[in-house]
């Protein structure tokens, strides 16, 4: 097949050569137009349309309109970020997964690795970029990136370095996904959830810290091990600050509705002959043990975050101990984020459960709030 197309000089009118540029523009791909920069001359070299495997295989039936779908973005592709990614993928929780990281080689490598495994998952669309535009229109954004504590560094200095990082991340997230929910995983999670709330100006229900969701899972697992019962049948809560100063609510621990405190009134105290308080000590020590042995924690927190993601995207209205603002509760007057039982759904945190605490448990919660507020008060936002 051969086509003849006139060469049009810049000095000539379109009508004088009988060429319709609008039609040409529609018919030709810009890459099939070669510019000759001589005397204002442009030369178009058309190429005949050739059949492709795709065109021979697929018959166009109708035009497709954009369909609303769910999208999750993860900021940070370190060990925690990738554990979150694979956990969400295996649960098939979203139609699209976007990954963001400044380490472009690692980002591309991790993404390709996941993409090649996508035939075994229910999420075929996995994208990545170091630019936040790839997160546009996310339903949920999970932040796992942040600075790590250096040897001898104060907690305040670590938080302040993370504030600088969060300022860049949050502004970009808000720009591209102004209606998303945020899950903060980076540590110290309670303070950084507060920072994300302040920087984003999002309503409080859309800012969620992973908080004590994992602490509570560890608590139930260890209780189950001690009793020889599956952890799903062990009901108990770890509240307050994620980490060393978390509060075990022994007054609420029960198995099949039987409160353990009814069987052992001193459970969880120094007077307890069975020393159940060691269960909570093990909860707080476990992370350090894992880090000592393998260098970091990843899988448990990844599965925990996927659990939160499922409750939000599927609007399950399940109860999770996540970090949220608790000003006005339990005698706390400061704007601090601590973990209490929250109902999670498509709007984020929809309701709080007013769990009854003993005076001792409430005192521990207030102490955590005071410690956090002393640090938050010194932050430069």
From Swiss-Prot:
Binding site for NAD(+): 101-106, 148, 187
Reaction equations catalysed: (S)-lactate + NAD(+) = pyruvate + NADH + H(+)
Signal peptide annotation: none
Database matches in Gene3D superfamilies: Lactate dehydrogenase/glycoside hydrolase, family 4, C-terminal, NAD(P)-binding Rossmann-like Domain
GO BP terms, alphabetized: lactate metabolic process; pyruvate metabolic process
Highest taxon in the source lineage: Eukaryota
Binding site residues for substrate: 155, 187, 218, 297
Gene Ontology CC, one term: mitochondrion
UniProt KW keywords: NAD, Oxidoreductase
Active site: 242 (proton acceptor)
CDD domains given in the database record: LDH_1
NCBIfam families: L-LDH-NAD (TIGR01771)
Family: Belongs to the LDH/MDH superfamily. LDH family.
Name of the featured protein: L-lactate dehydrogenase A-like 6B
């Amino acid at each position: 097949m051969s086509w003849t197309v006139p060469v049009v000089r810049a000095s000539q009118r379109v009508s004088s050569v009988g060429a319709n540029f609008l039609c040409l523009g529609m018919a030709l791909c810009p890459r099939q137009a070669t510019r000759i920069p001589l005397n204002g001359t442009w030369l178009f070299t058309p190429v005949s349309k050739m059949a492709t495997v795709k065109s021979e295989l697929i018959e166009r039936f109708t035009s497709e309109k954009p369909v609303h779908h769910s999208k999750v973005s993860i900021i940070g592709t370190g060990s925690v970020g990738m554990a979150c990614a694979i956990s969400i993928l295996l649960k098939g929780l979203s139609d699209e997964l976007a990954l963001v990281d400044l380490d472009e080689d690692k980002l591309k490598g991790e993404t390709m690795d996941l993409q090649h495994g996508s035939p075994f998952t229910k999420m075929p669309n996995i994208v990545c970029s170091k630019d936040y535009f790839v997160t546009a229109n996310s339903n949920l954004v999970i932040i796992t990136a942040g600075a790590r504590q250096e040897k001898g560094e104060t907690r305040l200095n670590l938080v302040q370095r993370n504030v600088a990082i969060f300022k860049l991340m949050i502004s970009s997230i808000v720009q591209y996904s102004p209606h998303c929910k945020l899950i903060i995983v980076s540590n110290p999670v309670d303070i950084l959830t507060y920072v994300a709330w302040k920087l984003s100006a999002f309503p409080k229900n859309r800012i969620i810290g992973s908080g004590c969701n994992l602490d509570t899972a560890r608590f139930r697992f260890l209780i189950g091990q001690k009793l020889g019962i599956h952890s799903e049948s062990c009901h108990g809560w770890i509240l307050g600050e994620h980490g060393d100063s978390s509060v075990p609510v022994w007054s609420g621990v029960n198995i099949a509705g039987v409160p353990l405190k009814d069987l052992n009134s001193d459970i969880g105290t120094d007077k307890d002959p069975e020393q159940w308080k060691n269960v909570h000590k093990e909860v707080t020590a476990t992370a350090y043990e894992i880090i000592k042995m393998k260098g970091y924690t990843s899988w448990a927190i990844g599965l925990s975050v996927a659990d939160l993601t499922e409750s939000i995207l599927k609007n399950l209205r399940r109860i999770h101990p996540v970090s949220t603002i608790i000003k006005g509760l339990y005698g706390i007057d400061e704007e601090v984020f601590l973990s209490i039982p929250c109902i999670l759904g498509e709007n984020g945190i929809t309701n709080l459960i007013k769990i009854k605490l003993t005076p001792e448990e409430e005192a521990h919660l207030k102490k955590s709030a005071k410690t956090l507020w002393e640090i938050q008060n010194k932050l430069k936002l």
